[in-house]
C-alpha cells in the first residue's frame, strides 16, 4: 500500500480492524502478575521503544517503593532540630512570687497586720485553718467599712480627661492572708494596673510604662 495514498480498499480496512481487535484481545487475555505485566516480553514486536522505556521506568519506581516500605511501612522520621532552652532569670519572669506573709516579703514593700485573736475560740483539726482565714477576711471587710482608704488611682502626671487621650496607669491594692499556729497576718501591697490578677500572691512590674512608681497607698509600705 502506498503510504501517500489515503484511500483504503475494503480488504485493507478489514485487515486494519482485524489487527486492532487482535491486539486488544491479546492484552485483555493476559494475566496481570504485578511488575511482570509491563515487561518487554508482554509488548508485541513492532511497538516503538518509547513504550518499553516507560514500562521499565514504571517497574523501577514500583520496586523502589516496595523496598522503602519494608519493615512495617513506616517512613523514617527526619531528625528535628534541637531547641535551646535558656534558663530564665528574675528579669524575664513575668510574676515574682511573694513569700509567706508570716516570714516577711524579702525587700518587697508591703504592710503587715497581726490580728488580735485574744478571746477567740479556735477549733482543732482541719477546720482550724478555715476559721483563721475567716477571721482574716472579717478583718479586711471591717477595715474597709470603718477606715475607708483613699482613691488608689494615682498617676505620675495630672489627670487630663480630654477625649481620646489615655489617663495613664494606676496601682491596684492586693491582699494576702497567712497563718502559722494561732497567729494570723494580713499582708497588703500594690501592683500596677497593667499586671494580671492571680490567685497566688505575686509582685509584678509595670509593662505599660504608664503606671506610677508609688501611689498614696504604697508610699507608706515598708
UniProtKB/Swiss-Prot annotation:
Subcellular location: Host cytoplasm
GO annotations of cellular component type: host cell cytoplasm
Any one Gene Ontology BP term: symbiont-mediated suppression of host JAK-STAT cascade via inhibition of STAT2 activity
Any one GO MF annotation of this record: ubiquitin-like ligase-substrate adaptor activity
Keyword RNA-binding part of the UniProt annotation: yes
Pfam families: Soyouz_module (PF14313), zf-Paramyx-P (PF13008)
Keywords: Host cytoplasm, Host-virus interaction, Inhibition of host innate immune response by virus, Inhibition of host interferon signaling pathway by virus, Inhibition of host MDA5 by virus, Inhibition of host RLR pathway by virus, Inhibition of host STAT1 by virus, Interferon antiviral system evasion, Metal-binding, RNA-binding, Ubl conjugation pathway, Viral immunoevasion, Zinc
Signal peptide feature range: none
Superkingdom as given in the UniProt entry: Viruses
Binding sites annotated in the UniProt record for Zn(2+) 1: 171, 190, 215, 218
Membrane-crossing residue ranges in chain numbering: none
Region (Disordered): 61-107
Positions annotated to bind Zn(2+) 2: 194, 206, 208, 211
Family as reported in the entry's similarity comment: Belongs to the paramyxoviruses V protein family.
Function comment: Plays an essential role in the inhibition of host immune response. Prevents the establishment of cellular antiviral state by blocking interferon-alpha/beta (IFN-alpha/beta) production and signaling pathway. Interacts with host IFIH1/MDA5 and DHX58/LGP2 to inhibit the transduction pathway involved in the activation of IFN-beta promoter, thus protecting the virus against cell antiviral state. Efficiently blocks type I IFN signaling following infection by behaving as a substrate receptor for CUL4-DDB1 E3 ligase complex and targeting host STAT1 for proteasomal degradation.
Oligomeric form and interacting partners: Interacts with host DDB1, STAT2 and IFIH1/MDA5. Interacts with host RIGI regulatory protein (via CARDs domain) and host TRIM25 (via SPRY domain); these interactions prevent TRIM25-mediated ubiquitination of RIG-I and disrupts downstream RIG-I signaling.
Protein name: Non-structural protein V
